[in-house]
Amino acid sequence: SIKMKPILKLSLLALFFSISLLARSIDDIKASGEIVIAVYEDFPPYSFMEDGVPKGIDIELGKKVANSLNVKPIWYFTGSDENLADDLRNTIWRGNLVHKTKADVMFRIPYDYDYLRMTNESTGELENEMVTIKGPYQSEKWIIATNKEIIPQIKTLAIFAYQTIGVEVDTLPDLHLSGFARGLIQKNVKHYTKFQEAINDFKNGKIDAIAGLKSQIEYLIDYKNNKDKYYLTQDIPQIKSQWDLATAVSSNYRDLSYHIDGLIDTAYKNNEIKEIFENFGVEYIAPISKTQ
């Protein structure tokens, strides 16, 4: 999938220039016959390329959106910026700086009250006033996976004063574990620029544990078929335990946002979303906002 990235981006650019460069209303989308759907690149099991074909949980959900409008999905694979506000600006309301394209909808956006009310420190304006965030479709959380033979269970993070744990750099687990108990376990926190590299070392026994997103860990270690080999925690102590993920649409086109919200709600109630997750070997956690 990594080798496909440059080719993929070039082909996507060609497609982008053949369609509208603006985020659009439902009528505009139907008239064009295409909907531009933004997903994060190289991010299994959510969105990734496999043998030149887009795959993933968010890809399947995006197909549902496209099918509901009877249009073709155009995939806009995007990297993650320094923060979510930048991601939303570059994909939804301002557009990419290079090719100016705006996506009609973006997946995997935190549906979190604190974020929805977050303001820009310099302007005092809402960070997300240019987008509307609706359609929560799953709940995600940070967890730790261990090799059962080495660490059969975790009662305290202090165990990593003696055992090694891998993290992706600059993630919340990295910051939390590195600073735990004033650096007590810092020497055993192994940093990786790519999470897949941490997974590889974990599976090969080079490190004893990994910390990351539950869905991603379950998929990458094939936990469903290896429950005898690995132990998963329910959370990471003292880290925000759980949050919902949803979709973002330009606030100029709330009709599209409400349409997607209704579509996802129906798919949730029909267990279609749960089935998508299970097809990728991931245990589905329903959105907090739909279970309270």
Roles of regions detected by a PLM:
Residues 5-13:
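Sec-dependent signal peptide recognition
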Residues 24-112:
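Extracytoplasmic small-molecule ligand-binding "clamshell" domains
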Residues 41, 138-143, 214-261, 283-292:
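Periplasmic-binding protein-like
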Residues 62-68, 148-151, 162-164, 241-280:
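Extended ligand-binding regions for polar small-molecule ligands
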Residues 63, 67-72, 135-138, 156-159, ...:
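Ligand-binding cleft/hinge of the Venus flytrap
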Residues 65, 92, 144, 160, ...:
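Hydrophobic residues within well-ordered alpha-helices
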Residues 75-157:
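Acidic, polar ligand-binding/catalytic clefts
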Residues 86, 109-123, 176-180, 203, ...:
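A ligand-binding cleft/hinge motif common to bilobed small-molecule-binding domains
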